[in-house]
Amino acid sequence: MSEHTLHYGDISWTMPVADKNLAAVLESNPVSLPVMEPDQAVREALRHPIGSPCLKDIVNPGEKICLLVPDVTRLWQSPAVYVHVMVEELNACGIPDSDILIVTATGTHRAHMGDEQARLLGEDICRRIRVIDHDCRDTAHLVHVGDTSRGTPVWFNSYAMACDKIIITCGVVYHFLAGFGGDLFEHGTLTSDNNPLVGIPLTDDCCLNIYAAAIRTFL
């Protein structure tokens, strides 16, 4: 008999497992990383990006900037660690707090409740920066940007689309329905209306529809 602890959000359970029922224990492989504080790592990544201009070469004073962040169901991506550094870097580029908008990419999830936004982004950021939850069912705040080649109408969050630049932040991981996460997935599913996902068989068509919707936005 052995005991194993399972973690779920802020909760964990320890359960006994009989040896005869234990097939294997899967553990993550150790990865050697540079010794660096999280803030420093984020700042270095922003100032020395791979295959992209630096933030200071992308944004300009006077522009409205939207930071698109995951919602509380993706808390493990630790946006509270990197968002405040991104805001500092934007400030250094001449973008004041008043010209920054944070939109949580909820997709079809519910809006945040209680202290969830503060847990997601940190209390200081929530005090300083306007934060709104995307609502895919609120048609009054969706804007039509065209149709995909597959005939799907594409609607995106009007608050985000009203900004001069949208900076997408998220983890790049596999999603069981839509393929690998990343910038197009975040923008294509999590700030749109219901249509990219409604009535589509759970096949490659779903993924293609999502990416087509996201790409359509940037054309």
Model-derived segments and spans:
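Glycine-rich phosphate/diphosphate-binding loops that line cofactor/substrate pockets in enzymes
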Residues: 50-66, 94-97
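Gly/Ser/Thr-rich loops at beta-strand to alpha-helix junctions
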Residues: 70-81, 106-112, 171-176
